[in-house]
UniProtKB/Swiss-Prot annotation:
Effect of residue 116 to A/N: Strongly reduced UDP-N-acetylglucosamine-dolichyl-phosphate N-acetylglucosaminephosphotransferase activity
Disease: Congenital disorder of glycosylation 1J: A form of congenital disorder of glycosylation, a multisystem disorder caused by a defect in glycoprotein biosynthesis and characterized by under-glycosylated serum glycoproteins. Congenital disorders of glycosylation result in a wide variety of clinical features, such as defects in the nervous system development, psychomotor retardation, dysmorphic features, hypotonia, coagulation disorders, and immunodeficiency.
Residue intervals annotated with topology Lumenal: 1-10, 79-91, 144-166, 214-218, 270-271, 401-408
GO cellular component, one term: endoplasmic reticulum membrane
Transmembrane intervals: 11-38, 59-78, 92-118, 122-143, 167-186, 193-213, 219-242, 251-269, 272-293, 376-400
Organism: Homo sapiens
MF annotations from Gene Ontology: glycosyltransferase activity; identical protein binding; metal ion binding; UDP-N-acetylglucosamine-dolichyl-phosphate N-acetylglucosaminephosphotransferase activity; UDP-N-acetylglucosamine-lysosomal-enzyme N-acetylglucosaminephosphotransferase activity
Annotated effect of mutating residue 302 to A: Loss of UDP-N-acetylglucosamine-dolichyl-phosphate N-acetylglucosaminephosphotransferase activity
UniProt-recorded name of the protein: UDP-N-acetylglucosamine--dolichyl-phosphate N-acetylglucosaminephosphotransferase
Annotated phenotype, changing residue 117 to I: In CMS13; mildly reduced UDP-N-acetylglucosamine-dolichyl-phosphate N-acetylglucosaminephosphotransferase activity
Family per record: Belongs to the glycosyltransferase 4 family.
Length: 408
């Protein structure tokens, strides 16, 4: 097994600077509180009885600290090349990958902050990560360009051992970036959840990278650690202020920043399949939410749980709509989901006609349906435990079940 002392010197420097980044994030967020409120980048917590103004878009602070850390860190992986005797050839491909990754993340932070300020529509939320992922795809094209995949064992009699996907591989990577940036944004709405799930995912990736340092792809995992270590500590600083009762909101800025950072290391670190497995709860939440996201079933602006003032606990939130406004497909999906105990449906009739009411289709509301009303802090902890369980399952698949599909 590797020892701490055997870690590359740039990684140790990265760790030290990241610890300073944690302190900076914890310090800067309250220091800028007044500036955000003065700029009207603030809002009220809908699940609290207090109507205190809370600063929003604080992900821009953790994102800025993250970028400063990595901008200052850029020379350290290439220190040997500052000494001519030790530098055989400058690793231009590594430098391009580092700069391209930072460009993609920087673009996503900027576009995420624009979303927080301008309150963009959902169709724009799909275009933003697509645009920000272009530098990432160009880096992959110029540095690697490999679009061949190893076919899983069950499909080899049909497709062979290797399959060249060509341009479809770039489409897959672009869709991965779009999914990662929006998946965290969809599973959100209660104190500490966005930053908490990102913290668990980043910790899981760090563990995975450290385990793989002895493997054949050591350089790829070292590259991933350059990003994941500072991301973990800056997110930890943000979570300190975002934990229940939240003193700040992370905003769409953080969700986009986190998602693009994960997409960057997954694509350029060549472990995108493992990355998707770490997103297991987010994938389930996305699939469960799809009927509302596609507006097959009416989707309100906010799908967060609602607070029962008497009990102080969160309960399911509902979407109410006229029954006749639901399409045949929507009616079919609702009936199937109800028969599978995935949604609660109520019918009512008023002077205006017949109405249907169903719980909003998110993982948060599904847990409340199964377990009943829960205190907000406990609900966040439960969701983070599910995220940890998802990571444990991912490691089991990656190091045990993978033998059923690939030669390892």
């Amino acid at each position: 097994m590797w020892a701490f002392s055997e870690l590359p010197m740039p990684l140790l420097i990265n760790l030290i600077v990241s610890l300073l980044g944690f302190v900076a994030t914890v310090t800067l967020i309250p220091a800028f509180r007044g500036h955000f409120i003065a700029a009207r980048l603030c809002g009220q917590d809908l699940n609290k009885t207090s109507r205190q103004q809370i600063p929003e878009s604080q992900g821009v602070i953790s994102g800025a600290v993250f970028l400063i850390i990595l901008f200052c860190f850029i020379p350290f992986p290439f220190l040997n090349c500052f000494v001519k005797e030790q530098c055989k050839a400058f690793p231009h491909h590594e430098f391009v990958a580092l700069i391209g990754a930072l460009l993609a993340i920087c673009c996503m932070i900027f576009l995420g902050f624009a979303d927080d300020v301008l309150n963009l529509r959902w169709r724009h939320k799909l275009l933003l990560p697509t645009a920000a992922s272009l530098p990432l795809l160009m880096v992959y094209f110029t540095n690697f360009g490999n679009t061949t995949i190893v076919v899983p064992k069950p499909f080899r009699p049909i497709l062979g051992l290797h399959l060249d996907l060509g341009i479809l591989y770039y489409v897959y990577m672009g869709l991965l970036a779009v999914f990662c940036t929006n998946a965290i944004n969809i599973l959100a709405g209660i104190n500490g959840l966005e930053a908490g799930q990102s913290l668990v995912i980043s910790a899981s990736i760090i563990v995975f990278n450290l385990v793989e340092l002895e493997g054949d792809c050591r350089d790829d995992h070292v590259f991933s650690l350059y990003f994941m270590i500072p991301f973990f500590f800056t997110t930890l600083g943000l979570l300190y202020h975002n934990w229940y009762p939240s003193r700040v909101f992370v905003g769409d800025t953080f969700c986009y920043f986190a998602g693009m950072t994960f997409a960057v290391v997954g694509i350029l670190g060549h472990f995108s399949k493992t990355m998707l497995l770490f997103f297991m709860p987010q994938v389930f939440n996305f699939l469960y939410s799809l009927p509302q996201l596609l507006h097959i079933i009416p989707c309100p602006r906010h799908r967060i749980p609602r607070l029962n003032i008497k009990t102080g606990k969160l309960e399911m939130s509902y979407s109410k709509f006229k029954t006749k406004s639901l399409s045949f497909l929507g009616t079919f999906i609702l009936k199937v989901a109800e028969s599978l105990q995935l949604v609660t449906v109520h019918q009512s009739e008023t002077e205006d006609g017949e109405f249907t009411e169903c719980n909003n289709m998110t993982l948060i509301n599904l847990l409340l349906k199964v377990l009943g009303p829960i205190h907000e802090r406990n609900l966040t902890l439960l969701l983070l435990l599910l995220q940890i369980l998802g990571s444990a399952i991912t490691f089991s698949i990656r190091y045990q079940l993978v033998r059923l599909f690939y030669d390892v």
